[in-house]
A protein has these predicted regions:
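Short linear regulatory motifs enriched in tryptophan with gly/pro/ser
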Residues: 1-212
Length: 212
């Protein structure tokens, strides 16, 4: 068992080089509407780097523990002042597994809330890809709030914060005096639950910080 630091070295974003590229589809289990991302990543990416890529692409804030489960082996980390990894994920790259097309593995985020992600290798190619890597090429659904409590509680909260309840809240605004400060806070709260759109451009802006 080894111990190392978290993400530090930049990923190679030079699109002129021809190197193995993996196309991954990441799906968050147990939520509806579906939350998923399709990513292009260099096969030489380490497990530690993939953790950061998935956090940025999905929209998580990296506030909790995580674990990868690949072919029955677990790779994860813990916080102790700074983020640290165990089982060598900061040096072990995906190429070492020789992942095949259509092969799957799992990514677990937050051991209390249990956000489980299914990761599927859709394609493996050695052809040149234009643009920086890693990159999100498709996706749908906004990531749940960090403190939503897991898929079941999140789905229950969506029912509480549905469109009907939102209209009732609008009616209460019409009936009473409005404090602008409180209104802004409450409106932001409703947007968290009602706006389920995925902003791919914003996700790629976050991912570009890893390629520098």
């Amino acid at each position: 068992m080894t111990e190392g630091s978290g993400y530090s070295a930049p990923m190679d974003s030079d699109s002129s080089e021809v190197s193995p590229v993996l196309e991954l589809r990441i799906s968050l289990r147990g939520v509806s509407p579906p939350v998923w991302r399709r990513l292009l990543i260099p096969e030489q990416i380490t497990i530690a780097q993939l953790h950061h890529v998935m956090q940025f692409a999905m929209g998580w804030n990296d506030e909790h523990l995580h674990r990868f489960i690949i072919r029955g082996w677990r790779y994860g980390g813990h916080r102790d002042g700074a983020f640290q990894f165990f089982d060598g994920p900061d040096t072990l790259n995906l190429a070492a597994f020789g992942l095949h097309e259509h092969e799957r593995f799992a990514y677990l985020y937050d051991f209390t809330s249990w956000w489980l992600h299914d990761v599927r290798v859709e394609r493996r190619t050695c052809h040149q890809r234009s643009g920086p890597l890693p990159r999100c090429v498709a996706g749908s659904g906004r990531c749940p709030p960090e403190d939503a409590g897991g898929p079941k509680r999140y789905m229950n909260a969506l029912e509480v914060h549905g469109e009907h309840e939102f209209l009732e809240w609008i009616e209460t605004l019409r009936e009473g005096q409005i404090d602008v400060g409180d209104l802004r806070v409450e409106a932001d709260e409703w947007l968290i639950w009602l706006d389920r759109r995925f902003d791919r451009r914003a996700a790629n802006e976050r991912l570009r910080t890893l390629a520098r």
